[in-house]
């Protein structure tokens, strides 16, 4: 009897460690959740129609991801740059009732189908300047329009996140 109890307790402990990423992202903004993603110099972040923010490397491989809640997605849409307000209705329709936590298929998370991808045009880095923690404190850059992670890092942010495929010029927002 004791060995069964220990086996069940061990399984419970293992399962609680298996998915800390999803639960740990609730209660924080989408910008804060995306800021925790791994990044590489020529990589980018894309928020797909399934509600999952994925970090890609320069070879279009997913290196990290974070499922976003519907509340996080709505908050993100409330902070769109003015130039993209004309796409707001479309984006609300795309993300209405979408919750990235419902995506549990590991293959979809790490190898999303073509319709959930949005390759970003890569540009040669214009500056080697690193994000400055003192500049990040005022979050001026968060939500600013961007076309590359380098532009956001120059402003003091972590990177550039694309939202859906509808935004003009294939740009994104700094986070």
Curated annotation (Swiss-Prot):
Induction: Up-regulated during co-cultivation with L.plantarum. Keywords: Glycoprotein, Signal. This is Lactobacillus up-regulated protein. Residues 1-18 form the signal peptide. It comes from the Eukaryota. It comes from Emericella nidulans (strain FGSC A4 / ATCC 38163 / CBS 112.46 / NRRL 194 / M139). Glycans are attached at residue 59.
């Amino acid at each position: 009897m004791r060995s069964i109890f220990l086996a069940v307790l061990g399984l419970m402990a293992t399962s609680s460690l298996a998915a800390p990423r999803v639960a740990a992202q609730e209660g924080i903004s989408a910008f804060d959740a995306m800021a925790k993603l791994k990044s590489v110099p020529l990589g980018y972040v894309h928020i797909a129609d399934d509600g999952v923010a994925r970090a890609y490397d320069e070879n279009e491989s997913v290196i990290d991801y974070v499922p976003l809640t519907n509340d996080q997605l709505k908050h993100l849409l409330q902070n769109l740059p003015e130039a993209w307000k004309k796409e707001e209705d479309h984006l609300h329709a795309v993300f209405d009732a979408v919750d990235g936590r419902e995506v549990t298929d590991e293959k979809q998370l790490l190898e999303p189908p073509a319709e959930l991808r949005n390759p970003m045009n890569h540009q040669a880095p214009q500056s080697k300047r690193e994000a400055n923690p003192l500049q990040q404190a005022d979050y001026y850059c968060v939500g600013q329009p961007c076309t590359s992670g380098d532009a956001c890092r120059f402003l003091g942010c972590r990177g550039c996140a694309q939202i859906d495929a509808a935004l003009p010029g294939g740009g994104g927002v700094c986070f």
